[in-house]
Structures are given as C-alpha cells and as structure tokens.
Amino acid sequence: MADLEKILERLGISPEKRCQVIKKEQVVRNMEKIFLGRDLSNRLLYTLACIAPKNADLGLLADLVDARVIKHESMLKECLRYTEKKDVSMEEMTRFVKRNEVSSEDVRKFVAKMRSDRVAKKDMVSKARKAMPCADFRVVVEEINKVPDDVDGGDEKRPLEGGWLEEGEIKKLPKPSEIPQINEEIRQAHLRRTGGRVVTRFPPEPNGILHIGHAKAINLNFEYAKKFGGYTYLRYDDTNPKNEEAEYFDSIYEDVRWLGFEPYKVTASSDYFDKMTEFGFQLIRKGKAYVCHLSQDEICERRRQYVSDGTNDRSHLSQYRDRPVSENLRLFQEMVDGKWEEGKACLRFKMDTDTKNPLMLDLVGIRILDVVHPRKNVKYTVYPTYEFALCVSDSLEDVTHSFCTREFYTRQESYNWLLVQLEIYKPIQWEFSRLNISNTVLSKRKLLPLKKYGIELDDPRLFTIKGMRRRGFPPEAINQFCRSLGFTFAETTVDVKKLENFVRDNLNRTSRRIMCVKEPLKVTIMNSTPCSISIPDLPGSSVVRDVPFTPVIYIEKSDFMEKGDKDFLRLTPEQPVGLYMLYPIRVVKVTPDGIVAERWDGVPRKFIHWVSEDSVEVEMRMYSSLWTSFSPKDATYLEEMNKDSLKVFHGLCDKRISDARIEDRFQFQRIGYFCVDKDTTKENIVVNLTIPLKNIA
C-alpha cells in the first residue's frame, strides 16, 4: 500500500483523491497488474486502471499504452470497447488505432465546419465526441475554446460572431450604395471617398463617464462596421461646453479601448465648427435660417402657444422670422464677430412647421456661449447646437449608418431636413431601444447625487464602465452580454443576473484559483511537518505554483462547528475533514487559541480550503447590489439604497497572491471571484468581490 501511495503521488494525484483510490479494491488490483515492469509516470496507465472493466485484457492494453500506440484517454476508451467482444492480438489492436486516429488538423476542420453550420458552442463538444470518438478530447476542447462564446452559465444563448447583427430589423438595413440621396452625384462622390465601406460613429457627450448602456451602443457601432469591412469614428459631441470637462475626453477614449475597440479616428463636433458656421450663412441665403433675439424661455413659450392655438400662424414662433436675408446675414456676422452677448441672439432654422413634430418648430442651430471650450482651449463666439452638429458631423465624416437610441426618433425629421437644405450627403438613421438594467441607475443626473454618500462614479457597485472594470467584470463578458440582447424598439429592463451569468462564465474559465479564508480560525496540526505542494492555476491547467504548508494553518471560521449537527459535513470535534490537496485531519482539542488537530487516515465526508501560517493578509471588500429593488423609482431612488451593500473583512490568502497586480482577477475557492483594487499598496492588498460563486459549499 505504501508503494501504491508513492506511485499515486508521483502521478500527481491529489491527497484527497489518493485517499479515495486506495479504498477501491478493483482499482488497486488493476494498478498492481498494470504498473508491474512498466513506466510508473504514465498517467494514462492510471486511467486504464480506473476505468477498465473486470474482463478487460489489461496486459494488452497496458502494452499499447506503454508503447505509446494509445496516446490519450479517448482512444483508450474506444480500444476497451473494441476488446470487450472478442480476443484480439497486438497487431490487430495497433491497426485499429492507426485506422481510427484523428489528427489535430481533422479536429480543426470539424470545429470550423460546426461554426459555418452555426452550431451553438454549448452543443459543439457533444457533437464532436459523437462524430470523432477517437479524437483526443483535450485537442477538441482547445479548438472549441477558440470559438467566440455563445452560451452563458445558464441556458441563455449568445449568437456566434456577427450573428447578433443578422436578426430582426437590423439585417434589413441598406448597403452604403443603396442609401437614398438627394441626387446620384452626391451618392457617387460619397462612394468614391469611402470605397463603398460601412462607416459608423460612437458620439458620446463628454459630460460624464460611460456606463453599460453606452457599451451596447459601442458594440453596435464598432461591430456593425467591422462585419462589413468598414470603420468607426469616436466622435465627441462637444457642443455644450458648460457641461463638459477635459477629463471626460480621455476617460471615454480609455473606456472604449478597454472594451476592446480601436477607433478609426478620434474626432469632435468642434472640429467642424467653422464649417457649420459657413453652413449657417448658406442657410440664411436660402431663406432657411434667421437671427432671433428671443430668450430660451420665450422660444419655448412661443412654441407652446403655436401648438395650442392651432392657427398655423408661423409668426407666433418669432416676430423675427421674416427678416430680410440681408439683415440676417449682417446680424449673424455680428454674432460670429462677438458683437452680441450670450442669450441676446441665436440662429434659428426656418423649418417646415406644418408637421406635428415639435422638433420642426424652428430649432436653434447656433447660439452664443461665453465660455472657453474644454478640449480646444479656445473661446469661440458661437457654438452649434447638438441638433445642427450631429447631422453635419455625420455627413462630413461620410457616416453611412447613424445609430441612435429610440428617444432620438423624433429628431430624424429635423436631421434629414437640414441635410437636404444643405444639399450634402445624407446617412441613414436607425434607432434601437436603450438598455435598462435592473437594480441600478445609470443616468448622470441620478449618479452625481451619490457623491454625498461617498460613492464616486467608478464605485464597483455602479454599472459605469469604470465601476465594472474596478469590480472585475471582464470586458469580453460585458461585450457578450450586450450582443446577447439583440435590438428591439420596445424598451425593457434586463435582469442584472443575465449580465452576472456572462461574468461568472468568463471568470470561471479564466481566473486563477487562490485559497483565502475570510474569517480565519487557527488550527495546529500536531503530527505534521512543513512542506510545499503544487497546485494548478486552473483546473486541468499545466501551469502549477507551489503553495507552502505549515503545521499551523487557518481555516474558515464557518468550516468548524463545536456542536455539529447531522447536516453539517465539515469539521467538528467528532467529525474529521479533508484539507484541500493534502490529507484529512481530526480534532484533538479546542482551545481559546484555536483548534489542535492531528492527521487522520480515514476518508472524510468533505474537503475544505486552508492557508498556511505565513499567508498574506488582504482587505476584502464584499460588495452586493446598491439597490435591492428591481427598478429603483425616480423620486425615491436615494431612499431605496441598500445601506449594507459593502462589508469589509480582513482575510488571509495563500502566497500565490503576493505577485498580484491591480485589476488581476482571481477565484477565491468556495467564496467567489475577486479583483485587485486600485487602492492596493505594497503594504496592503485590497480586493473587490466581483461576483459570488453560484454554489458556495
């Protein structure tokens, strides 16, 4: 038995698994036969011992494994099935193996075919196993893991790459060459400039940081252009400098790149202010714009009266509407020259007021603002409005598909009207529903008041891009979530659990495992000596790291119960427990200083994690939802905040966390997924709970 235990240890079998193996008489007998005179380090021989039925020809199969004819478990299982029904020779078995071998190239081709056949990733493994039972399963899994994820931790589907853009109304959008234009000359000139490629833009206003809703728009714009071989601008809508700050320009660019997207070019509406001023003069000359001296409040009141009177008397909109063109040109030039004060004059569009659309009631196109532009560091005399800048910037950048959220639908008419009057290229507009997510708020108007509670915009409890990044959400998971939603006109609220499923699934596959105890309980093991054990970074990973073991360890306080009950499966004075990757222990006595235990040779009911005496202290910030209600109400969302959404523990981690860097992600076994916070220093590692495990043992 001692020799067998050494063989198992040499094969890298974990201590708890060794305890189980030596209790299985059939496996022990198989191992004694198989390893006699053969390579004791061959893990496949151990597999044969574990899976071989009683009547198997162990000698023949072991010889084939030892000779490296059978090289992996899948082929071994097929050989076992083949030999079940008849006696075969070494030569026949060798021919069987050669005949059924599946190369890595064959696996790659089969996975590629499944992708082209639109097989969901969750179904690929079973299909591959059925079609290629003799293929090396590790190679199959490696190839399938290269496929973009299409299934989360539950049953919700993620489309294959590009597939999410081929469903619903979005797949009906016209090609660049099919987009209606004022005339064919404009269309052909545009196609020459772009080469007929799709051009999109993501146009955020630099007055705050991005959130999960923006991530959906970013994915749409960048991925739609990519699908058709096009490109995407990142364009700052910087037409409202009083609400904008220089820091947000850099912050937005950083967030877009962190999500994995690289803009074709970074621009701003302000890059085209001079051109928009020229267009202002052009519209005046066409009789489509005039200088107005009404205040903003007066303009709103005049519009209200115009709609309520129902007389269609356009002079109600402004007494300045019918000024002569020459006077409008002179006054607008005075505005440009800085001769008018803020609020004393603006340029309004002379629009088609027969429509019922309130955004066609002579919009303000250019106004005077007494402020220095935060990006240009220039004090412009006149500033175009959002309504003017959006469509003109889209046209000047040859944007083919202008994507906006549904609330901008009413702006479509004014957008097209302006481009027609200017006789320039006209993109197609397409609206989609805004992303609302449960148990949170997203608007800047609601987020800024949180500062008085000590909650900044990058707080891990918020669903801003920076908040999610700090919490440890992988950008790939955020993108997959956004692409899973599809596009509809109906506005709904998505359960945050859907996003969490994507995050958990990603972290389960990618995050290094660490042992950590949140509330340490000291255990002294009497009959033990210091040693070092090798633990893989991930289950099945070839990358292993050494973890020191000392006679004094710490376990989770909740893993011990002085007076246990029948449902408690971990350590009690009467019930031993196994230590992960080590051996079982049992309690000798309980003292004020902790537990005194000793090594035990039995088979425990449960294994628990632990850390050694020289472990690393970490500050654990255990976050939960900032709002417990599914949809926080506008009027009471501050009162609805969860006052217990952050709890701080000072836990102990094994030595593997010593080299952690900010934003590194880990799975703390049996606790959850964590991310190293930016507050970390050399003296103090701070980690944020990203998301709990689905089932905490």
Curated annotation (Swiss-Prot):
ATP binds at residues 205-207, 211-217, 405, 434-435, 442-444. It catalyses: tRNA(Gln) + L-glutamine + ATP = L-glutaminyl-tRNA(Gln) + AMP + diphosphate. InterPro entries: aa-tRNA-synth_I_CS (IPR001412), Gln-tRNA-synth (IPR004514), Gln/Glu-tRNA_Ligase (IPR050132), Glu/Gln-tRNA-synth (IPR000924), Glu/Gln-tRNA-synth_Ib_cat-dom (IPR020058), Glu/Gln-tRNA-synth_Ib_codon-bd (IPR020059), Rbsml_bL25/Gln-tRNA_synth_N (IPR020056), Ribosomal_bL25/Gln-tRNA_synth (IPR011035). Keywords: Aminoacyl-tRNA synthetase, ATP-binding, Ligase, Nucleotide-binding, Protein biosynthesis. Its EC number is 6.1.1.18. L-glutamine binds at residues 237, 386. A motif ('HIGH' region) lies at residues 204-214. It comes from Encephalitozoon cuniculi (strain GB-M1). Belongs to the class-I aminoacyl-tRNA synthetase family. GO terms for cellular component: cytosol. This is Probable glutamine--tRNA ligase.
